[in-house]
A protein has these predicted regions:
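Catalytic cores of nucleotide-sugar-dependent glycosyltransferases that transfer UDP/GDP/TDP-activated
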Residues: 1-703
Length: 703
């Protein structure tokens, strides 16, 4: 495949959220080998970073000409390097200047693609505007650099948060090949989170995606996923199990499966022992107890804090069933780690005091103060199970609710520094499109338990049994919770009973399995997806008129030129019929000059608490006023033009309009101190859907 410039867009570039960050960061060097260090550009969001978070971005002007080309762009762009192995070229997008155009942008996507953004909120708008901004920046790069050099390009967008770039470029730069990759589906993740049906994948064909997306309040995100899957040149996902999900929920079967690689990361016995000791010390600080290193095993579960989807519930349930069994095994004990980032504050003061030798106190279960401990699922389940970490108990649980990135004042180690110290990784996922956490465990030589509901679980099951791979795959599809918990309990006991030599054999098997996941073994799948995307872009390129493939320049506008912005209507050749030239336009009432102040009055909600002003609009057409829920903008647009002309000739009405307009101007230009009233909702007018209950009505009444 000839080298093409590869733009890769993700919300997780320089922004660790979940497994996609690992996917992209771990294969940078393989990508650079194929596209060249200067042919790969990662694009991520310019998001605020809390103080103390490890920096992932370093400013670096790797192309001064590009900086110059983007300096006047409406999208803010930071140029630099992503601080992962390979340090790829990186652009961070600041989409804040697009906020004012949000409705226009979303409206255009609705008109062209049927993208339903009606029920979106800012957790939807912000990523969509980021991706749209990324598309605008790529369009500028295409115009200034790629077209003159006749250079082909590929854009791969990960997840719905990046998909708007594909939609923009389909029109703005159709010769660029596009790949959309979903690492999970929004609707699938939400459906699974209810844990309602153990036959999740078998029952997908009976799901109505639109109905369920609306019921679960993910309709806009689901719509973006569906549209992107439909419109991209190549649609990909990470596993066969997720491909099945995509087919039923998004309406298109993925063209290529892109398994996630990682490779082996074997550690020396000394480093493993050091990591194990750090985990013991952290547990002792948390519980205040002491552990016999020879009789205690360390279990670990890590990942996103998706309580049901990640199998946290069944993990704790199975562990809670072990005390009697452990007591009968010569006093063996287990420490059950749950490394799941949650809303947290500082390390618990009592634990901090213990670390500095100044306090004992009762045992703890969580290393940090939680923002909402009352509603924390792990805390509540531990309470229900009676796990209190009392001294000497066979089962202790330690919840670590932070990102282990080495910046915490108490836990200075990173996740990958601590992971090798675990004896067993336990990942009994209910929903797991791939499953990086068991793969990471295996890569560091830690035996693991996963399930047939994980893409990695299904892949590794095809490589052999537990003794060959180091991984046990539990059945979860079609199995009820109690049976899964019992099976996991039995699997844990079998591991606990293994002689030390057998556990060492499993570690060696893990490393061999991890070697199979080296990115060099999986990049062929990416090459296939990119080949298809380039072919699709090349086919469209042949169909484009030459002026679309020329470096655009701003034409001189005149009434005869037929020019509209950057797009110029070419004159028809002699003997030819000119092609139709279409433009979107809006039909709206033009107010008579005498009534112009009504437009300004309508634009200021001041009229809402002045009944005599509201009556100006009501007198225009009382029936229409009520029908439109007292919406003055809609009224002025929809009332018959003849009625507006009649009112313009009514001297008394015009005088009243002028008087009240002057009153509004005077009242809004007072020099008195201003008061800003902040509230989440306001009940101001029926057509303004900004309230949901009594709080909004109260706020509106105050105004």
């Amino acid at each position: 495949m000839s080298k093409a410039v590869f733009f890769e867009i993700s919300w997780e570039v320089c922004n660790m959220v979940g497994g996609i960050h690992t996917v992209l960061a771990s294969r940078v060097k393989e990508v650079q080998q194929r596209h060249g260090a200067d042919g790969y550009i990662a694009i991520g969001p310019d998001v605020p970073r809390a103080e103390g978070i490890a920096p992932e971005f370093r400013a670096d002007i790797w192309d001064p000409e590009l900086v110059e080309a983007l300096k006047d762009h409406e999208v803010g762009v930071m140029m630099g390097r992503w601080l992962v192995p390979g340090e790829p070229r990186c652009l961070l997008i600041n989409q804040s200047r697009l906020y004012a155009r949000k409705d226009e942008i979303l409206g255009r996507y609705w008109e062209k693609y049927g993208l339903d953004s009606l029920f979106g909120a800012w957790d939807y708008y912000d990523p969509v505007l980021f991706a749209h901004g990324a598309g605008l920046v790529i369009e500028r790069i295409r115009d200034q650099f790629l077209l003159p050099a006749r250079q082909s390009a590929i854009v791969q967008a990960h997840e719905w948060m990046s998909a708007a770039a594909i939609l923009h470029l389909q029109t703005a730069a159709p010769e660029i090949g596009t790949v959309f990759t979903t690492h999970a589906t929004m609707l699938g993740r939400s459906l699974a989170g209810r844990r309602a049906d153990p036959n999740f994948y078998q029952s997908l064909s009976s799901v109505d995606p639109e109905v369920e997306a609306k019921a679960l309040n993910v309709s806009s995100k689901h719509s973006m996923e569906t549209v992107a899957a439909r419109e991209a040149d190549v649609f990909t996902t990470v596993s066969e199990i997720t491909a099945l999900e995509c087919k039923h929920l998004l309406g298109r079967k993925p063209d290529v499966i892109l398994p996630n690689g990682f490779g082996a990361r074997p550690v020396s016995p000394e480093l493993r022992q050091r990591a194990r000791e750090e985990l013991f010390k952290l547990a002792e600080l948390t519980t205040g107890d002491h552990y016999d290193r020879d009789k205690t095993l360390i279990l670990a579960l890590a990942g996103r804090y998706e309580y049901i989807n990640k199998g946290v519930d069944v993990y704790l349930d199975a562990a809670a069933a072990l005390p009697a069994e452990l007591a009968a095994r010569d006093g063996k004990r287990i420490i059950v780690y749950a490394m799941l980032p949650a809303g947290h504050a500082e390390p618990k003061r009592q634990l901090w005091d213990r670390a500095h030798g100044t306090s004992a106190g009762p045992p703890l279960r969580c290393t940090h103060d939680l923002v909402d401990e009352t509603n924390d699922p792990i805390t509540n389940q531990l309470n229900a199970l009676g796990i209190d970490n009392r001294p000497g108990a066979p089962v202790h649980v330690v919840h670590v609710p932070i990102y282990l990135d080495g910046t915490d004042p108490l836990i200075r180690q990173r996740y990958w520094d601590l992971l090798p110290g675990a004896d067993l990784g336990v990942f009994p996922s209910f929903y797991e499109p791939w499953g990086y956490t068991p793969l990471e465990a295996v890569a560091f030589g830690v035996p693991a338990i996963t399930t047939d509901r994980a893409g990695f679980g299904r892949w590794v099951a095809g490589q052999g049994d537990r003794t060959r791979t180091g991984v046990r795959v539990l059945r979860r599809e079609g199995v009820v919770f109690t049976e899964v918990s019992a099976a996991l309990k039995q699997a844990l006991l079998e591991f606990i009973d293994l002689p030390a030599a057998d556990r060492e054999s499993l570690r060696e098997a893990c490393v061999r399995t991890a070697e199979l996941t080296d990115w060099s073994n999986f990049m062929g799948h990416y090459e296939e997806a990119h080949r298809r995307a380039l072919a699709a872009g090349a086919a469209r390129r042949k169909e484009l008129p030459m002026e679309r493939l020329s470096v655009p320049s701003m034409p001189t506008l005149s009434s005869e030129s037929g020019a509209f912005g950057l797009f110029v209507k070419p004159p028809a050749k002699e003997g030819e019929v000119g092609a139709p030239y279409t433009r979107t336009f809006v039909v709206a009432n033009a107010l008579p000059e005498e009534l112009d102040p009504l437009q300004e009055i309508a634009g200021n909600l001041w009229w809402r608490w002045h009944p005599e002003v509201a009556s100006l609009f009501e007198r225009i057409d009382p029936a229409l006023w009520l029908k439109l829920e007292e919406n003055p903008h809609a009224l002025l647009d929809q009332v018959k033009p003849d009625r507006l002309l009649d009112l313009a000739m009514d001297d008394q009405y015009v005088a009243e309009v002028q008087r009240l307009h002057c009153l509004m101007v005077e009242s809004t230009q007072m020099q008195d101190p201003r008061i800003a009233y902040f509230c989440m909702e306001f009940g101001i007018a029926g057509f303004l859907k900004l309230y949901s209950g009594g709080l909004g009505i109260l706020a509106g009444d105050h105004l």
